[in-house]
């Protein structure tokens, strides 16, 4: 191999390495931040929502993104889908652990996997689910007591979130299963509690109508092109205010 060929070979190897590292970095940067100390939901704070886009370079979409979430579900970006044929669930029981992330409560699943959904022909694996109180999305200006996000990811790293809204009313059987575990970590930021085997199919999706739009993560880095599917029917529960406020 002559000197020119060697130089070309080295250049190609280095280029391939840099490209691979860049792709790996991109694949890890889109995930939502779990450390609540890096940002705040208080608008009057230096690290509040209005400043998220300036806190870190990789969070710039929080300030400049044009497809940000949450939004009001009456927004023109949203369409009402009247059947669930485009959303097929293939969930299965899986070991799970609850974590108090400060800004929300998260249920993360074990490495064995908790199944997936199919959205428009593409499979998205369920990574975790978490709750926000009060709700982040609104419906005709109305904010609800609780909002569940079921976060999914496809093979290319794209995200899809299935959302269920809750109001005060009859107890919800799925939340009821978690009440004791939730209460144990309510006042302990970053605390974790093993839950045992959880079946995501137990989460009630009692409607064949849902809202669909393309948005973003609702926490930094505010990654866009997230497929949001918000169940139209609002669920109920009577105890969650104790655990999520």
Swiss-Prot record:
Location(s) in or outside the cell:
Plastid, Chloroplast stroma
Residues modified by carbohydrate are 95, 120, 156
Q: Which InterPro entries does the protein's record reference?
A: Alpha_CA_prokaryot-like, CA_dom, CA_dom_sf, Carbonic_anhydrase_a-class, Carbonic_anhydrase_a-class_CS
Kindly list the cofactors needed.
Answer: Zn(2+)
EC number(s) from the headed UniProt entry: 4.2.1.1
Specify the enzyme's EC class, one word.
Answer: lyase
Q: In which tissues is it expressed?
A: Expressed in stems and roots.
What family does the entry list?
Belongs to the alpha-class carbonic anhydrase family.
Q: List the protein's name.
A: Alpha carbonic anhydrase 2
């Amino acid at each position: 191999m002559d000197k020119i060929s060697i130089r070309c070979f080295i250049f190609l190897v280095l280029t391939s390495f840099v490209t691979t590292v860049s792709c790996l970095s991109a694949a890890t940067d889109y995930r939502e931040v779990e450390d609540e100390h890096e940002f705040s939901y208080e608008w009057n704070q230096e690290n509040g929502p209005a400043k998220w886009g300036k806190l870190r370079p990789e969070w710039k979409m929080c300030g400049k993104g044009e497809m940000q979430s949450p939004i009001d579900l009456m927004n023109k970006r949203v369409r009402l889908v009247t059947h669930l044929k485009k959303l097929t669930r293939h969930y299965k029981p899986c070991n799970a652990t609850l974590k108090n992330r400060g800004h929300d409560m998260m249920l993360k699943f074990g490495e064995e996997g908790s199944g997936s959904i199919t959205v428009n022909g593409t499979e998205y694996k369920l990574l975790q689910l978490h709750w926000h109180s009060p709700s982040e999305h609104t419906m005709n200006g109305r904010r609800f007591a609780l909002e569940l996000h079921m976060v999914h990811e496809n093979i290319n790293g794209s995200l899809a979130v299935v959302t269920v809204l809750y109001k005060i009313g009859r107890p919800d059987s799925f939340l009821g299963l978690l009440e004791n575990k939730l209460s144990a970590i309510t006042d302990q930021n970053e605390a974790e509690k093993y839950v045992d085997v959880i079946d995501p199919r137990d989460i009630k999706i009692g409607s064949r109508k849902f809202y669909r739009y393309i948005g973003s993560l609702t926490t930094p880095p505010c990654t866009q092109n997230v497929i949001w599917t918000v169940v139209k029917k609002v669920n109920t529960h009577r105890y969650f205010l104790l655990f999520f406020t």
